[in-house]
From Swiss-Prot:
GO MF, any single term: neutral L-amino acid:sodium symporter activity
Database matches in CDD domains: SLC6sbd_SBAT1 (cd11522)
UniProt-listed NCBIfam families: Na_transp
Record-linked InterPro entries: B(0)AT2, Na/ntran_symport, Neutral_aa_SLC6, SNS_sf
Bilayer disposition of the protein: Multi-pass membrane protein
Name of the protein: Sodium-dependent neutral amino acid transporter B(0)AT2
UniProt KW keywords: Amino-acid transport, Glycoprotein, Ion transport, Membrane, Neurotransmitter transport, Phosphoprotein, Sodium, Sodium transport, Symport, Transmembrane, Transmembrane helix, Transport
Catalytic activity: L-leucine(in) + Na(+)(in) = L-leucine(out) + Na(+)(out); L-isoleucine(in) + Na(+)(in) = L-isoleucine(out) + Na(+)(out); L-methionine(in) + Na(+)(in) = L-methionine(out) + Na(+)(out); L-proline(in) + Na(+)(in) = L-proline(out) + Na(+)(out)
Gene that produces this protein: Slc6a15
Length: 729
């Protein structure tokens, strides 16, 4: 692509220093703050004259008040609940400390390059996901629509999880915590412990019976759970109020929602390190099992976690970056946010396993105490001789080391009869190996551990407030991935669209607050996003590298950043990343095919979970979720390819922003202009002369070079303009 002669070639190190200074610069003058608050998009202010009334309209796009606000928004979107309850589980399951190496490798090979790609296209084209991919190629415009559909599917159930967290948060202001003990059941004759709770645990019972009031299968609706319905309504009201003014409102909230979780995690880490057993948990967590690095499953799960941890394919990354200045160093942002995400995951893993180590130590002490009593009974009845017990061991107050010595002795002496003695080894590692993830970690394992904390209500309030903020940060990015592209494309008022979007989502979300709602959350989590997002990101990579052209894209980046990106990205975007994404897609499809579609149902009579297969209608819903999410891609391609919709009426609308209002202004196009905008290749154009009205008035007089090899003419030419026009494609 033709280079902008005004570009200043800067040294990469100097550019990074500038970015850091910009990020840490918060002491702006009153005039600077006023200028930033004006939400000006272009370097030069553009003013257009309305054809009907001759009034001037400031063509402005909302922008971030500061670089710090933008970084916090990206961090808030990428750092979510998965960092707390998914990454630690994967780390423990896949080799402990050894898992970090494949994760880091894949972060460098897949994560950072693709994250940088999404930031770049959003910042350069200054549109949401629909407008960006329409600009690259109208035939690939369905990629943006697919991203919006996936975002909406995810938002539907993700906010339900925030609703659950709100419920636990509201119940945490009690001493003792309501899930501390099993409830008692009274009848006319006597009082006894609730059988379902006695068979499981107090926290498990509270989660399934008190919070979810869960049914025994997905086919048993059981009606609405009114407590959770109210919490879901509160969650959607919070999201709606935060998003109703776009980044003007959500950006300010990000200062708290993005930073508060780090305060809580650090407090939890310091407190848990002072508890018995926490070091055992951390040691168990990070003890590397190097042999597991050779297993393909470990690499597949690491790649999947990298992919979803950064929010690739959702459109939120593109939407947030579209509000940046054009010369913002998005490469610095990509590296910074990616490593903040990684170190947050490691910090959360330290906290989780320090707390679980403390919990395992308590469980282990109970196990030793109970089994020591059993050994004393065996000694008193003569089943085991006192002579085999070392004299220095006191079974009334036995330590873990002494118990294991006695256990090993009895196992050798009573080798044939040992099984009938029902003694347990009571190893703390056995408890730590019972890895849990997701809601099981947050609402069962972690809540149980916190009941043993001094001042447990305080820590419970802090923990669930942290989860609420983590969830809301991700929700803001997800909703922005829906709102921004739709506003850019269909010219609707952002406030009205936000309210309608949230209201409709709440109504659909009522299916998740039935007594069987937890099973629908599992269904949507398993099938609505994984494969569709992989396909979306593969198509994004292909669109930039092969349709638009990797060389032209790198020239755009050089013009935009002021320095040439490393050749590393050329090879990643053109060869390595597409190959690895396709491999990951195939591996995910194979894994999905080998795993029977089903869910873990809570069986009241057994007080335990049991795997059940989905009924036939459930299978249809699972398949429909995947198809609906990716359907816009072929539909838009066929419509554009076959010209089923006439775009060349000569009256397109371009969106402008003024004082928070979205205005429509007609742009009359000559025939040649329309053919350019609608993506016709040069051979299909009726005239080589460009029309007069394609571009709005520019502040300079840039030189246009034609692209003899450009496939989509207008996409090539528009990117050369210092102040790129707002494309409606």
């Amino acid at each position: 692509m033709p280079k902008n002669s005004k570009v200043v070639k800067r040294d990469l190190d100097d550019d990074v220093i500038e970015s850091v200074k910009d990020l840490l610069s918060n002491e702006d003058s009153v005039e600077d703050v006023s200028k930033k608050s004006e939400l000006i998009v272009d370097v030069q202010e553009e003013k257009d004259t309305d054809a009907e009334d001759g009034s001037e309209v400031d063509d402005e796009r909302p922008a971030w008040n500061s670089k710090l606000q933008y970084i916090l928004a990206q961090v808030g979107f990428s750092v979510g609940l998965g960092n707390v309850w998914r990454f630690p589980y994967l780390c423990q399951k896949n080799g402990g400390g050894a898992y970090l190496l494949p994760y880091l490798i894949l972060l460098l090979v897949i994560g950072i390059p693709l994250f940088f790609l999404e930031l770049s296209v959003g910042q350069r084209i200054r549109r949401g996901s629909i407008g960006v991919w329409n600009y690259i190629s109208p035939k690939l415009g369905g990629i943006g629509f697919a991203s919006c559909v996936v975002c909406y599917f995810v938002a539907l159930y993700y906010n339900v999880i925030i609703g659950w967290t709100l419920f636990y948060f509201s119940q945490s202001f009690q001493q003792p915590l309501p899930w501390d003990q099993c409830p008692l059941v009274k009848n006319a004759s006597h009082t006894y412990i609730e059988p379902e709770c006695e068979k499981s645990s107090a926290t498990t019972y509270y989660w399934y019976r008190e919070a979810l009031a869960i049914s025994s299968s997905i086919s048993e609706s059981g009606g609405l759970n009114w407590k959770m319905t109210g919490c879901l309504l509160a969650a959607w009201v919070m999201v709606c109020l935060a998003m109703i003014k776009g980044i003007q409102s959500s950006g300010k909230i990000m200062y708290f929602s993005s930073l508060f979780p780090y305060v809580v995690l650090i407090c939890f880490l310091i407190r848990s390190l002072l508890l018995n057993g926490s070091i055992d948990g951390i040691r168990h967590m990070f003890t590397p099992k190097l042999e597991m690095m050779l297993e393909p499953k470990v690499w597949r799960e690491a790649a999947t976690q990298v992919f979803f941890a950064l929010g690739l394919g959702f459109g939120g990354v593109i939407a947030f970056s579209s509000y940046n200045k054009r010369d913002n160093n998005c490469h610095f942002d990509a590296v910074l946010v990616s490593f903040i995400n990684f170190f947050t995951s490691v910090l959360a893993t330290l906290v989780v396993f320090a707390v679980l180590g403390f919990k395992a130590n308590i469980v282990n002490e109970k196990c030793i105490s109970q089994n020591s009593e059993m050994i004393l009974k065996l000694l008193k009845t003569g089943n085991v001789s006192w002579d085999v017990i070392p004299r220095h061991i006191n079974l009334s107050a036995v330590t873990a080391e002494d118990y294991h010595v006695v256990y090993d002795i009895i196992q050798k002496v009573k080798e044939e009869e040992f099984a009938v003695l029902h003694l347990k080894a009571c190893q703390i590692e056995d408890e730590l190996n019972k890895a849990v993830q997701g809601t099981g970690l947050a609402f069962i394992a972690f809540t149980e551990a916190m009941t043993h904390f001094p001042a447990s209500p305080f820590w419970s309030v802090m923990f669930f407030l942290m989860l609420i903020n983590l969830g809301l940060g991700s929700m803001f990015g997800t909703i922005e991935g829906i709102i921004t592209p739709v506003v850019d494309t269909f010219k609707v008022r952002k406030e009205i669209l936000t309210v309608i979007c949230c209201l409709l989502a709440f109504c659909i979300g009522l299916m998740f607050v039935q007594r069987s709602g937890n099973y629908f959350v599992t269904m949507f989590d398993d099938y609505s996003a994984t494969l569709p997002l992989l396909i979306v990101v593969i198509l994004e990579n292909i669109a930039v590298s092969f349709v638009y052209g990797i060389d032209k894209f790198l020239e755009d980046l050089t013009d935009m950043l002021g320095f040439a990106p490393s050749k590393y990205y050329y090879y990643m975007w053109k060869y390595i990343s597409p190959l690895m994404l396709v491999t990951l897609l195939i591996a995910s499809i194979v894994n999905m095919g080998l795993s029977p579609p089903g869910y873990n149902a809570w069986i009241k009579e057994k007080a335990s979970e049991e795997f059940l297969s989905y009924p036939m209608w459930g299978m249809v819903v699972c398949f429909s979720l995947m198809v609906l999410a990716i359907l816009p891609v072929p539909v838009v391609f066929v419509i554009r390819r076959c010209n089923l919709i006439d775009d060349s009426s000569g009256n397109l609308a371009s969106v402008t922003y003024k004082r928070g209002r979205v205005l429509k202004e007609p742009v009359n196009l000559d025939g040649d202009d329309a053919s350019l905008i609608h993506g016709k290749i040069p051979s299909e154009m009726s005239s080589p002369n460009f029309g007069k009205n394609i571009y709005r008035k520019q502040s300079g007089s840039p030189t246009l070079d034609t692209a003899p090899n450009g496939r989509y003419g207008i996409g090539y030419l528009m990117a050369d303009m210092p102040d790129m026009p707002e494309s409606d494609l």
